[in-house]
């Protein structure tokens, strides 16, 4: 019996051990802000849940709420740009795109003390010329893989259900801090996915976790493990 126990102990050392499951990760992103009291409520909810998100801020909205842009950055969220005027880059000349990006960068710098790290083109619209411009501006382009169209669907239950149905490890979730229903849905989604073991990362963190290099002038929409 003693020899048998010793043999089993030796086998236990030699056999491969199971590894703890890697955390499932997603990135929550918000476009078109800041938006006054709605963004304040969202930031309060994110802080209470220990979640950092990525905000793609519009320059003209930073003009209205510079203190909120500063708060977003100060609380550890990632700040990308959504352009200055929310005009579609594909309908603009190269010079116009350059001016728009420059203005958006200047406004974010003035409000937060830091330059944008990422770009989400308005409407998600881009072409080869736009990618060339973003490369010159040193901005990777970030799209999304889950879109509940919360800017159009003002129903927190429907928005929440859509996201929970489609979210998977590596998803980049598109939302807007423009309506009460969107903010409500975002906080519900966090609660539900955290209960399922998901971890919320910024876009840059999610890309790094997946081993993806964010490249200026290149567009990415998700970062599966």
Q: For the regions a protein language model found, what residue spans apply to each?
A:
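C-terminal domain-boundary segment and adjacent tail
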Residues: 48-49, 63, 181-225
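Hydrophobic core
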Residues: 9-13
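Positively charged n-region of N-terminal signal peptides that target proteins for export
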Residues: 1-4
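Alpha-helical scaffold elements lining the catalytic groove of polysaccharide deacetylases
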Residues: 38-41, 87-115, 123-169, 182-188
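Active-site beta->alpha N-cap acidic-glycine motif
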Residues: 19-92, 96-110, 116, 192, ...
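Structural recognition of the beta-strand scaffold that forms the well-ordered cores
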Residues: 26-29, 53-57, 78-81, 117-121, ...
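Active-site beta-loop-alpha junctions enriched in small/polar residues
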Residues: 33, 58-60, 84, 122-124, ...
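Cleavable N-terminal signal peptides
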Residues: 7, 17-19
């Amino acid at each position: 019996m003693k020899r048998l126990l010793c043999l089993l102990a030796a086998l236990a050392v030699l056999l491969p051990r199971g590894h703890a499951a890697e955390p499932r990760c997603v990135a929550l992103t918000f476009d078109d802000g800041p938006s006054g009291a709605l963004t304040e409520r969202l930031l309060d909810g994110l802080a209470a849940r220990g979640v950092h998100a990525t905000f793609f801020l519009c320059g003209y909205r930073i003009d209205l709420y510079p203190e909120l842009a500063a708060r977003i950055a100060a609380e550890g969220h990632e700040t990308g740009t959504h352009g200055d005027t929310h005009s579609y880059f594909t309908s603009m000349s190269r010079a116009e795109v350059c001016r728009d990006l420059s203005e958006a960068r200047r406004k974010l710098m003035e409000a937060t003390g830091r330059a944008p790290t990422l770009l989400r083109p308005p409407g998600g619209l881009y072409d080869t010329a736009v990618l060339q411009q973003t490369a010159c501006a040193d901005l990777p382009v970030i799209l999304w893989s889950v879109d509940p169209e919360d800017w159009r669907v003002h129903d927190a239950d429907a928005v929440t259900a859509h996201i929970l149905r489609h979210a998977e490890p590596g998803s980049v979730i598109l939302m807007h801090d423009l309506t009460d229903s969107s903010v409500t849905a975002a906080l519900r989604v966090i609660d539900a996915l955290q209960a399922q073991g998901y971890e919320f990362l910024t876009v840059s963190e999610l890309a790094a976790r997946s081993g993806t290099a964010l490249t200026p002038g290149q567009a990415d929409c998700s970062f599966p493990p």
